[in-house]
């Protein structure tokens, strides 16, 4: 077999192996996407309810009487400090990306939109503190001189509520210590398998303005809801506020992971389809070259036979 034919055959075999790998990766991503969508659907009910509770408490002016400057005697983070508003000197930005590649344009879109958000609202990188969830985002912002105040790598492909707790504790602690004066969560929101959109949600300080009143019915408009609280407003909020923060961060992670798996599945399908096209082209090239080689051999044999006669 001529060297050119051997090279084409080698490329065909190599591309077939690549196609098998990308097809397997597509199947895995599709399975993960299906699984995480079930988690996201069931979780959305809880997330909507906890947001509604905080919104109602805010509208009832229950949050106005809370002492947000008090310190816990046990040394734990003051969760009521999540309500404290102060002049903004530094903005904290949570950026959710993946730890690895092979996810199409997922990471690049989130990073690009986050950079635009920063550049449009801040004059210097010193005004921003990055909280990176995912190694891709952490590495990107470190290389460009940003202050990566906290990074969280190795989060599960199907994250659990427990995964968000240490992250939320760190976020609230840094806000309480005035590492930043406001906090936004930036991530890719899953729309459908082929579409996602960038979102930047304000998480801290907690206020009704951040959440809107979408969860309130029209019958609530114009009324001030009165609550009787036991044992106290502070005791209730010390339980509810961390749950709200955890729900917001976990919801964003869950949404971002859904978008990541969808992007990965689409990217691997595209890679598999491209590999099939390349294989078809190479096989056609191989068959033509082989046919040409056979024709040449027959011509040479016929010519040699004629010369002998």
From Swiss-Prot:
Subcellular localization: Cell membrane
Any single Pfam family the record assigns to this protein: ATP-synt
PANTHER family registered for this protein in UniProt: ATP SYNTHASE GAMMA CHAIN, ATP SYNTHASE SUBUNIT GAMMA, MITOCHONDRIAL
NCBIfam families membership: ATPsyn_F1gamma, PRK05621.2-1
Gene Ontology cellular-component annotations: plasma membrane; proton-transporting ATP synthase complex
UniProt keyword annotations, A-Z: ATP synthesis, Cell membrane, CF(1), Hydrogen ion transport, Ion transport, Membrane, Transport
Presence of the UniProt keyword Amino-acid biosynthesis in the record: no
Organism field: Ligilactobacillus salivarius (strain UCC118)
Family per record: Belongs to the ATPase gamma chain family.
Gene3D superfamilies with a match to the protein in the record: 3.40.1380.10, ATP synthase, gamma subunit, helix hairpin domain
GO molecular function: ATP binding; proton-transporting ATP synthase activity, rotational mechanism
Membrane topology of this protein: Peripheral membrane protein
Phylogenetic lineage: Bacteria, Bacillati, Bacillota, Bacilli, Lactobacillales
Function: Produces ATP from ADP in the presence of a proton gradient across the membrane. The gamma chain is believed to be important in regulating ATPase activity and the flow of protons through the CF(0) complex.
HAMAP family, per database record: ATP_synth_gamma_bact
Name of the protein in its database record: ATP synthase gamma chain
InterPro entries noted in UniProt: ATP_synth_F1_ATPase_gsu, ATP_synth_F1_gsu
Assembly with partners or alone: F-type ATPases have 2 components, CF(1) - the catalytic core - and CF(0) - the membrane proton channel. CF(1) has five subunits: alpha(3), beta(3), gamma(1), delta(1), epsilon(1). CF(0) has three main subunits: a, b and c.
GO biological process: proton motive force-driven plasma membrane ATP synthesis
């Amino acid at each position: 077999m001529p060297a050119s034919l051997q090279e084409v055959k080698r490329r065909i075999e190599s591309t077939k192996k690549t196609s098998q790998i990308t097809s397997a990766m597509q199947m895995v991503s599709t399975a993960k996407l299906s699984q995480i969508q079930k988690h996201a659907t069931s979780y959305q009910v809880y997330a909507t309810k906890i947001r509604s509770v905080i919104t109602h408490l805010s509208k009832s002016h229950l949050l106005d009487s809370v002492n947000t400057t008090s310190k816990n005697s046990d040394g734990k983070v003051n969760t009521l400090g999540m309500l404290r508003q102060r002049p903004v000197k530094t903005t904290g930005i949570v950026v959710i990306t993946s730890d690895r590649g092979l996810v199409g344009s997922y990471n690049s879109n989130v990073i690009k939109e986050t950079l635009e958000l920063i550049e449009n609202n801040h004059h210097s990188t010193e005004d921003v503190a990055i909280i990176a969830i995912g190694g891709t985002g952490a590495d990107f912002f470190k290389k460009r001189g940003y202050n990566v105040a906290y990074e969280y790598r190795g989060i599960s492909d199907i994250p659990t509520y427990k995964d968000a707790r240490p992250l939320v504790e760190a976020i609230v602690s840094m806000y309480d210590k005035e590492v930043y004066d406001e906090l936004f969560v930036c991530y890719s929101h899953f729309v459908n398998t082929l579409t996602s959109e960038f979102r930047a949600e304000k998480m801290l300080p907690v206020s009704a303005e951040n959440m809107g009143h979408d969860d309130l019915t029209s019958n609530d408009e114009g009324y001030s809801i009165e609550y009787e609280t036991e044992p106290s407003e502070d005791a209730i909020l010390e339980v509810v506020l961390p749950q709200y923060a955890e729900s917001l961060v976990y919801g964003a992670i869950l949404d971002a992971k859904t978008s990541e798996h969808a992007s990965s599945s689409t990217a691997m399908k595209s890679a598999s389809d491209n590999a099939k096209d390349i294989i078809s082209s190479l096989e056609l090239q191989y068959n033509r070259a082989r046919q040409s080689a056979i024709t040449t051999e027959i011509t040479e044999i016929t010519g040699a036979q004629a010369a002998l006669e």
